[in-house]
Amino acid sequence: MKHVDIFTDGACSGNPGPGGWGAVLRYGEVEKELCGGEAETTNNRMELMAAISALQALKSPCEVDLYTDSAYVKDGISKWIFGWKKNGWKTSDKKPVKNAELWQALEEARNRHKVTLHWVKGHAGHPENERADELARRGMEPFKKGKAVSF
């Protein structure tokens, strides 16, 4: 099974507001950068989209070390999701889980691989996390007010 390192980040200008996500995938010496964004979103949704998009980009099952600066993503997929599923996608106080469709997509993407999640401190000089942050900002740029969007 191939081993891939993935570094993800999300960004939002306003919360909610325009946002972007970025990911760096590394397999040996080969690297791939991904980014995207939305006009109206939240930082948590962008953090989730970064992880989902990166895992979905892998063409075959891989052993993955996924690095995120989002405790929300790390704790959600490794701790909270089990209770949410058991409770019919409701929180412990019976409210609908925010971003449930993204959590479900992340779980589906994760289940195709052997994923180990790692939390890294954001904006602390971690080179790959800084690159993922730059990509997230690049993904957000077309959606900021006054910017033209080209396709």
Curated annotation (Swiss-Prot):
Q: Which positions does UniProt annotate for Mg(2+) 1 binding?
A: 9, 47, 69
Question: Sorted alphabetically, which InterPro entries does this protein's record hold?
Answer: RNase_H (IPR050092), RNaseH-like_sf (IPR012337), RNaseH_domain (IPR002156), RNaseH_sf (IPR036397), RNaseHI (IPR022892)
Tell me the SUPFAM superfamilies matching this sequence.
Ribonuclease H-like
Q: Give the subcellular location.
A: Cytoplasm
Q: Which UniProt keywords apply?
A: Cytoplasm, Endonuclease, Hydrolase, Magnesium, Metal-binding, Nuclease
Query: Where would you say this protein principally sits, based on its record?
Result: cytoplasm
Q: Name one GO cellular component term.
A: cytoplasm
Pfam family for this entry, one: RNase_H
Q: So what family is this one in? A: Belongs to the RNase H family.
**Protein name from the UniProt record:** Ribonuclease H
> What organism, scientifically named, is this protein from?
Rhizobium etli (strain ATCC 51251 / DSM 11541 / JCM 21823 / NBRC 15573 / CFN 42)
